């Protein structure tokens, strides 16, 4: 079995026969160091949290080559966005051909056949029946748009969300998020009328319930909190427009709720006419082995927010929602570059690649393989408290002897993996979860190599061989 899908074989023989991973100079190398210093002089620190001192030069499939010639296996996928990997021939061809025809037309003022086809496909694969689409540029502005739709369609002022939620960096998205206080410090006043409730984390929740053994008990605690505390004492339910949720919390640490949670939550929300908005920017477009992670929980949201992987990371997002709520004021969802012909070409190619190459099935099979191997590794190392996920969205929680989060150990494991040629980030509300979100084209052969690196990184960290650690959201 090759390390790349057969569709990648227009690549040169050099790439096909490439050794992976390949570390020719200890990262960061001299060229990377030089560029990082130049960046510090001209780019604001606000643009991101630099998880790794990595400067990519090119990519192919699930691999990234940096400016110093090091080749890494990528378990980050540009924040779970590079769904079809890097430089997929079909994607490259579609984008090149479209640029040669016309690179920009604005769907806010004219019409676009490409954008229409992408919207038709999204409506087809969405679990929401009779839906329409609004296009955006990033997950953050798509969250803002979903807030606007929620308030416009219900004429209600309040938004509910979950503790641990990451929804983006625009003002509205920051306002509904509850991931790290560092992302809100200094920006008040944010959008008013937002309230948060606990997310049903089976492994680590405020009630101390083992949600794997007692899922119904955990579900009931959250729903009781919402109905008998929030709706009775904090926010009038008839003034709540929507509840925003990630079907699987991503940046909070790949937190998978009990299977029946969202189905029961939707029943409660419907009693009060409250919309359920699923933020699937990270979980959607095949990441979990289904087009949308909402499908795992047998729930039909009123809106789904998408982004990241829909155009393989090339800057498309949006909202899919029930027709009766999506027709808002003309022009109020207008963004100049949204779904322009080039981005739409990338999205159309991405959706076709996922279908034609059975990447939903691949995400399930390779994800199950990784989960199985990680659970075997867990049996050998007490520092692994939990392994969880769906498809190619997997979290490994690192803990101390007393079960408390161990971000220090997590950061060192991820740094050692980076030195060995694996891009492996640490995330989580406490910075102690290894996040695995590789491109959907990942094969079992490459995954096995990555797992060998993870196990070695754990051993090297436990024996005191690792001094540095990766940066995380803290």
From Swiss-Prot:
Source organism (scientific name): Pyrococcus horikoshii (strain ATCC 700860 / DSM 12428 / JCM 9974 / NBRC 100139 / OT-3)
EC numbers, comma separated: 5.1.1.-, 5.1.1.1
Reactions performed catalytically: L-alanine = D-alanine; L-serine = D-serine
Recorded family membership: Belongs to the class-III pyridoxal-phosphate-dependent aminotransferase family.
Ligand binding (pyridoxal 5'-phosphate): 139-140, 282, 336
Notes on activation and inhibition: Completely inhibited by hydroxylamine hydrochloride.
Variant or mutagenesis effect after changing residue 251 to A: Loss of activity
Known role: Catalyzes the interconversion of L-alanine and D-alanine, and L-serine and D-serine. Has weak activity with valine and threonine.
Superkingdom per UniProt: Archaea
Temperature effects on activity: Highly stable at high temperatures.
Description of how the protein assembles with itself and partners: Homohexamer.
Protein name: Alanine/serine racemase
MF GO annotations: alanine racemase activity; identical protein binding; pyridoxal phosphate binding; serine racemase activity; transaminase activity
């Amino acid at each position: 079995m090759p390390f790349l899908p057969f569709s990648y074989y227009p690549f040169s023989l050099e790439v096909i026969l490439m050794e992976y991973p390949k570390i020719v100079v200890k990262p960061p190398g001299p060229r990377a160091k030089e560029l990082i210093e130049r960046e510090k002089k001209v780019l604001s620190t606000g643009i991101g949290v630099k998880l790794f001192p990595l400067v990519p030069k090119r990519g192919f499939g699930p691999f990234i080559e940096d400016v110093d010639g090091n080749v890494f296996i990528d378990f980050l996928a540009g924040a779970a966005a590079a769904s079809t990997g890097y430089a997929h021939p079909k994607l490259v061809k579609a984008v090149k051909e479209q640029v040669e025809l016309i690179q920009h037309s604005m769907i806010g003022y004219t019409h676009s056949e490409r954008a229409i086809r992408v919207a038709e496909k999204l409506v087809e694969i969405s679990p929401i029946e009779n839906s329409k689409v609004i296009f955006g540029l990033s997950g953050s502005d798509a969250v803002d748009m979903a807030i606007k739709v929620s308030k416009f369609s219900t004429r209600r002022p309040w938004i509910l969300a979950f503790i641990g939620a990451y929804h983006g960096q625009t003002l509205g998205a920051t306002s509904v998020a509850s991931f790290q206080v560092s992302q809100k410090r200094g920006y008040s006043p944010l959008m008013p009328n937002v309230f948060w409730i606990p997310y049903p984390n089976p492994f680590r929740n405020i009630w101390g319930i083992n949600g794997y053994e007692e899922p119904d008990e955990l579900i009931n605690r959250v729903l009781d909190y919402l109905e008998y505390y929030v709706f009775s004492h904090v926010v009038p339910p008839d003034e709540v427009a929507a509840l925003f949720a990630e079907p699987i919390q991503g940046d909070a640490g790949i937190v998978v709720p009990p299977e029946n949670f969202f189905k029961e939550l939707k029943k409660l929300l419907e009693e009060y006419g409250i919309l359920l908005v699923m933020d699937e920017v990270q979980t959607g477009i095949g990441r979990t082995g289904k087009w949308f992670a909402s499908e795992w929980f047998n729930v039909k949201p009123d809106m789904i927010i998408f982004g990241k992987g829909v155009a393989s990371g090339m800057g498309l997002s949006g909202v899919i929602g029930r027709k009766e709520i999506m027709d808002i004021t003309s022009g109020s969802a207008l963004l100049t570059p949204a779904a322009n012909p080039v981005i739409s070409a990338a999205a159309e190619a991405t959706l076709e690649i996922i279908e034609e190459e059975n990447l939903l099935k691949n995400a399930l099979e390779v994800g199950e393989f990784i989960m199985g191997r990680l659970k075997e590794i867990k049996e050998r190392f007490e520092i692994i408290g939990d392994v969880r996920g769906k498809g190619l969205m997997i979290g490994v929680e690192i803990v101390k002897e007393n079960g408390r989060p161990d971000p220090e150990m997590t950061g060192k494991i991820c740094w050692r993996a980076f030195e060995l040629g694996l891009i492996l980030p640490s995330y989580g509300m406490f910075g102690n979860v290894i996040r695995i979100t590789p491109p959907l084209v990942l094969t079992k052969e490459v995954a096995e190599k990555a797992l060998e690196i993870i196990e070695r990184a754990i051993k090297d960290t436990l024996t005191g061989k690792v001094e540095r650690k990766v940066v995380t959201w803290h």
